[in-house]
Amino acid sequence: MAGLLPRAYGGVLRRSYIYLGSQCSNSVSRLTVGSTFRLVRMKSWGTSKFHTNGSPVLNEIKKISKSNGITIINPLVNKVTTNNVSTSSNGKAAVAAATAATAVSLGSTGQDDALSRNTDFLHIQNILLQKNQDRMNKQKLLSEATNFYERFKINTKWLLIRGNRPFSADEIGTLFSWIILSQILWIILGTTTFVSILLIIFNTVFAKEMVGNVVGKLLNIFLDGIDVKFQDALVPEWRKGCIRFNNVQLRTHPLQASEPENINDYNELVNNMIEFDLKLHQIELSLSLKKWLLGNGLIQDLTIMGMRGNITVTPVSLENKIDDNQRVNLIDWFSNPYYHLGNVKVTDSSIILHDNQLSKDFKVSIYNLDMPQLRFQWIINDFLSSNVVDGSINHSLFNIHKRQHKLAYIKDLENDLSDWKRITRIRLDSIDVKKLGLNNSNAFNWMDDGQLDIIADVMLPNEQENEPDFDFTRNKKEHMSKSNNKYVVLDLKFRFKDLKAIFPDRAPRLSNGEEILSLDELKQIILFINRKYDLYHSYANSSYKNTLWDAPNIAINKAKSFPVTTVFQSKKDFSNEDSDEEDRKLKKQIIRFHDDISTPNNELVLSCKVVKNINELKNMVLFWETGIYDSLSMELYIDLMKMVEEWEYKKKTNWMTDWGSSVASQLIIVGFGAMV
């Protein structure tokens, strides 16, 4: 039984739902709330409006109801009483009309709300009954199934289409598209997991060594000039969420020697900048398809353990640049300079770094390195921002870490450091000058021997979250309102121990070939350093090797143009404990007319500060490319010249003071003699 009538409220035609009773007898048709209902969708009968009086549809309903003996008591309680009539076509139509009349609004707002509440309740009851019927049908089908395949088929179809009928063409297309989309989403969100499952499948089906060789050959296709070999299986590490490679070998292709006329070729210079032959005990990495789609590389996080091998670096100096507008940097060697890595860790590694520019070999050992990120365009900045770096250069320890404050860390201190992202402390302990290659450098070619300690505090500016590449030209007003700081400040202290100098063949020069100072000016520096060196060693030898040192009140006369009498007080043994204070006063010391020893260990301390724009570090891999070495050299020479001038002034002042006092004393004596 179905009744299709529109409902009008406020003169606007709308769709609605009515519920028709299905409980009819041969003699009586009665609609009650407790009857079984089913949902019938009402459709519009055109654009005619319903009114309480005068509507042709309402008049027709009344006429049919009256002819069949149906009396509408109250349309709001869904209760209709009928007279005893036989079920005929007119009776069915009358029941439909009477039931539809209960859904027609009579112009009262309260009556419409009550009817709406009743229909919602009946709608919910109908849904629950339908679900119960579907559940009974599913249980019946499962009980009739004879094996697992049939039960799986029934459950799958019931989950997808709520039935056991065959799939239609539209449903098959929908399922296929959803499978494809889910796989694409899985690859994007879980690239490492996807590749790990592929490796497990390949390792199961094929030999593990063959899988490693195939993967290595595929990588060689995409990596120009680099050979990759996997000597062991590729094992996914599920607990760490990464892929592990054991016994990996990386090697650059041997390049053929270029012809003499092609030495200045740009591509040839770039290809010969880096050569390496490395063996890695273990590599763990995770992948990210999102980074690869953005052009930042496929590898997300990287962990290297047990790296051994040789690396040869041939920097192209400014003197050998191709032209004035083209500069060759080490970043040009990388095929993708926009490569970004996430967390990078290197442990238990040792390599031999050969610098062709200095013709020196450096043995670099890395005990522990932890970098939160590594961007090829900002290698220097990211390296200085490392969480920790511990290692050694030619068996001299170095470390990079966040500087520890001597005072307690309070909120005021945090506000003072708000302009800086962090302050990094770099320390290099007791490295030999020759092993460091300073004697072969252009700027300090006069250094012959000695030890060097370096302490540097590097202050890095804050990095904007929306500007990871330090592009200060974009959103300039917004950036300048937050922070005006875009400079890197390096505060360095060089402590030379037992430094010895020789006269070089050519004057010190910067990386671009410009002279720092002339050879005549360099003579004063060499004289000052060697005088300190000779004085310290003569003092040490006389203290520990001279047998006359034990004799009291020894006077040493030296033939110089000015008095150089030096008095040493001998060390005496006192048995009386009360004389300890007097013993402390009787120290070996140099009295006047002699060059003072500034430090007991013959140390030469030079301090300097270098300020660099952060944008000048972009696309720079080596420090000498940034020009920091040239700035450091100039600052060190300025500080060294100040020390030499102070030493000469002090020596001259002491001589003039002594000469004046001696002449005055002689004049006084002569005067007294004349008076007598």
UniProtKB/Swiss-Prot annotation:
Domain of life: Eukaryota
Annotated transmembrane regions: 184-204, 656-676
Alphabetized InterPro entries for the sequence: Mdm31/Mdm32
Keyword Mitochondrion: yes
GO cellular component, one term: mitochondrial inner membrane
Function in brief: Involved in the organization of the mitochondrial membranes and the global structure of the mitochondria. Also required for mitochondrial distribution and mobility as well as for the maintenance of mitochondrial DNA nucleoids structures.
Family affiliation: Belongs to the MDM31/MDM32 family.
This protein's name: Mitochondrial distribution and morphology protein 32
Lineage of producing organism: Eukaryota, Fungi, Dikarya, Ascomycota, Saccharomycotina
